[in-house]
């Protein structure tokens, strides 16, 4: 009888812990900025990235008609009063009293990187296609996105322990995990869905893992030597534990306007 009671209690505790963890996994990816706490799709985009408009020549669009109007500025944040939560001691909690915490994830001000491109082995560069905040992030090859300019350029806001927020040079918005993909949204240093861990790989690439959902950025590769002139969907998926191509990202020089190596008429 005693064993049965213990078994029932164990089952109850397992169910309780699972229910609690599931509740906090299925929360609003925009944090306190827009929508209800448990709304996993506040922008009503769906959970899968939908392909951009089929354009003969890829070009930037406004995209204001694709998403609802959302606050331009992030919600107010504060620093923690706890001596145990600071830049040296780690990450402040995401939740407080079954709501989002309003404290900064890290107490310190971030260092800011130089401008860079985030480029996958397939040639897919993380790119803002629709300028209005809340639109999906896509992967474009550099040659097919020449007209996008700084929408393909990023800066890292660098925090301790290889964490960073990733800010677009054109829109000044940050990468925000959303559903199974990524949107760009006003930078909010209290939102765990905007904080990314850079995990070094042996070939100088990095995996980019989201703090909020624990998943890594992926651009699926179907043909490593043939995936040219295509638009890549960008996902967040379970982080690969073994060798892979589609979760590798190189932080490399930005594609600002380059001068030609030779002028017309010069000997080559």
From Swiss-Prot:
Domain of life (superkingdom): Bacteria
UniProt key word Membrane: yes
Ricin B-type lectin domain residues: 112-252
InterPro entries: CDtoxinA, CDtoxinA/C, Ricin_B-like_lectins
Lipid attachment, kind N-palmitoyl cysteine: 20
Signal sequence interval, chain numbering: 1-19
Membrane topology (UniProt): Lipid-anchor
Function field: CDTs are cytotoxins which induce cell distension, growth arrest in G2/M phase, nucleus swelling, and chromatin fragmentation in HeLa cells.
Name of protein: Cytolethal distending toxin subunit A
Organism: Campylobacter jejuni subsp. jejuni serotype O:2 (strain ATCC 700819 / NCTC 11168)
Gene: cdtA
């Amino acid at each position: 009888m005693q064993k049965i009671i213990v078994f029932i209690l164990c089952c109850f505790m397992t169910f309780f812990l699972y229910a609690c963890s599931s509740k906090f996994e299925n929360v609003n990816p925009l944090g306190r900025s827009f929508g209800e706490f448990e709304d996993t799709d506040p922008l009503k985009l769906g959970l899968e990235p939908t392909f951009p408009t089929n354009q003969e020549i890829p070009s930037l669009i406004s995209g204001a008609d694709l998403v609802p109007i959302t606050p331009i500025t992030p919600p107010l944040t504060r620093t923690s009063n706890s001596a145990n939560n600071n830049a040296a001691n780690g990450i402040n909690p995401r939740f407080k009293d079954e709501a989002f915490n309003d404290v900064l994830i890290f107490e310190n001000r971030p260092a800011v990187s130089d401008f860079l491109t985030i480029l996958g082995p397939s040639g897919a560069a993380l790119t803002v296609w629709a300028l209005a905040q809340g639109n999906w992030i896509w992967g474009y090859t550099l040659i097919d996105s020449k007209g996008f300019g700084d929408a393909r350029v990023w800066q890292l806001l660098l925090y301790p322990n290889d964490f960073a927020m990733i800010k677009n040079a054109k829109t000044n918005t940050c990468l925000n995990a959303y559903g199974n993909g990524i949107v760009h949204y006003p930078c909010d240093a209290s939102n765990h869905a905007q904080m990314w861990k850079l995990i070094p790989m042996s070939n100088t690439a990095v995996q980019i893992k989201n703090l909020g959902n624990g998943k890594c950025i992926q651009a699926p590769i179907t043909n490593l030597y043939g995936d040219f002139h295509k638009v890549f969907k960008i996902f967040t998926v379970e982080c690969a534990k073994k060798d892979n191509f589609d979760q590798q990202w190189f932080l490399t020089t930005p594609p600002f306007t380059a001068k030609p190596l030779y002028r017309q008429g010069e000997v080559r």
